[in-house]
């Protein structure tokens, strides 16, 4: 009747005894968007923070063992949601949408979280590895939307006559050559979050100021100082509070994996990156010098000397069309699986 199965109902209601239901019991029925048993459709529409919240609510209803939390809040007070899948001691962190017009990375990590939970619950493999083994060996933390205010700006959540939209447009006027709002990468205050971490921040400032990015705007403004923004502060604090063995930061575009920061060479970092590249078809490269400072990946490697990666998905001009989603996800499912498997051994 509801397009569901007894197995799905049992998974959504742990501890339920179908032969002994007290009167007044409330049962979660995960009605199907599983058309013919297929996965939940993640990559067909533009994302907003509100839509992300609904998808997370659905994941939690279908798989109560998935943990939900928040690592902090955005400038406008939106929660920076975090999902955790797994129960082992070792941990990894996958984040997406540091950059607003790279929002297609949000459903990529969200779908992986859902698929891992689904394969664990019902049996199966993900990225070529047994999902139950991954689940039992460690925890994967997902922060699917680091920059919700910026994503909402790009995807039309704010009315053109709203105060938020008008303020962003005023900042964009500092850079008339950049399309608005499509060219917006920054948070709603006009700071590029992936240039706001304390790893060569002064060098990043020198480079970007020389390129003309001296004021808040759609992209490439490094901020007044490192960790000046609530979103970057939240990510840094959350990282310090945990003991991540590996991190992946998702961006677009280029079909490339960046694995190094300066002369830091964390143990097995290149080898893991090579495996990710071989499995995905992406290139494994050094970060271009003009973009080689003050990113989350750079800071993580500098502080912990552990493998950290920036993965640039897809090809074309940001924001990438949703028509690329299936191809992007197919390439990155093995990347995320390899990151976990290599960190949990």
Regions found by a protein language model. Give the residues of each.
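Stable alpha-helical elements in mature extracytoplasmic
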Residues: 2-5, 20, 48, 52-55, ...
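Extracellular LysM carbohydrate-binding repeats and other cell-envelope/extracellular binding modules
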Residues: 5-37
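Metallocarboxypeptidase
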Residues: 182, 197-345
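Active-site/substrate-binding loop(s) of hydrolase catalytic cores
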Residues: 89, 103-258, 266
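Active-site-proximal beta-strand/loop segments in catalytic clefts of secreted hydrolases
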Residues: 12, 30-32, 71-73, 85, ...
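Loop/turn elements at helix/coil->beta-strand transitions in domains of secreted/extracellular proteins
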Residues: 64-67, 78-80, 88-91, 136-141, ...
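Short glycine- and acidic-rich boundary segments immediately preceding or forming the N-terminal edge
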Residues: 8, 31-76
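Alpha-helical scaffolding within the catalytic cores
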Residues: 77-80, 126-129, 291-298
């Amino acid at each position: 009747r509801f397009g569901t199965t007894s197995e799905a109902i049992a998974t959504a209601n742990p501890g339920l005894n179908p032969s002994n239901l007290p009167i007044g019991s409330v049962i979660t029925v995960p009605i199907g968007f599983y058309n013919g048993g297929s996965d939940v459709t993640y990559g067909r529409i533009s994302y907003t923070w509100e839509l992300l919240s609904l998808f997370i609510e659905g994941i939690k209803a279908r798989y109560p063992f998935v943990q939900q939390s928040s690592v902090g809040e955005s400038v406008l007070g939106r929660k920076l949601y975090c999902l955790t899948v797994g129960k082992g001691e070792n941990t990894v962190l996958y984040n997406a949408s540091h950059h607003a017009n790279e929002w297609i990375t949000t459903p990529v990590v969200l779908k992986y979280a859902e698929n891992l939970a689904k394969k664990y619950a019902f049996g199966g493999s993900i990225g070529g590895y047994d999902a139950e083994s991954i689940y039992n060996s460690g925890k994967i933390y997902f922060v699917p939307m680091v920059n919700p205010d910026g994503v909402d700006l790009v995807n039309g959540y704010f009315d053109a006559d709203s105060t938020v939209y008008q303020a962003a447009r005023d900042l964009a006027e500092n850079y008339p050559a950049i399309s608005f709002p499509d060219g917006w990468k920054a948070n709603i205050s006009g700071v590029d979050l992936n240039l706001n971490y304390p790893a060569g921040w002064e060098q990043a400032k020198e480079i970007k100021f020389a390129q003309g990015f001296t004021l808040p705007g759609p992209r490439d403004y490094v901020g007044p100082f490192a960790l000046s923004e609530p979103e970057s502060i939240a990510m840094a604090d959350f990282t310090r509070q945990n003991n991540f063995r590996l991190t992946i930061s998702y961006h677009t575009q280029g079909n490339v994996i960046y694995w190094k920061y300066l002369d830091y060479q964390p143990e097995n970092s290149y080898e893991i990156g090579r495996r990710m590249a071989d499995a995905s078809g992406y290139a494994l490269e050094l970060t271009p010098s003009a973009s080689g400072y003050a990113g989350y990946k750079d800071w993580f490697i500098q502080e912990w000397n552990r493998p950290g990666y920036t993965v640039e998905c897809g090809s074309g001009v940001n924001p990438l069309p949703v028509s690329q989603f299936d191809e992007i996800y197919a390439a990155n499912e093995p990347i995320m699986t390899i990151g976990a498997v290599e960190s949990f051994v």
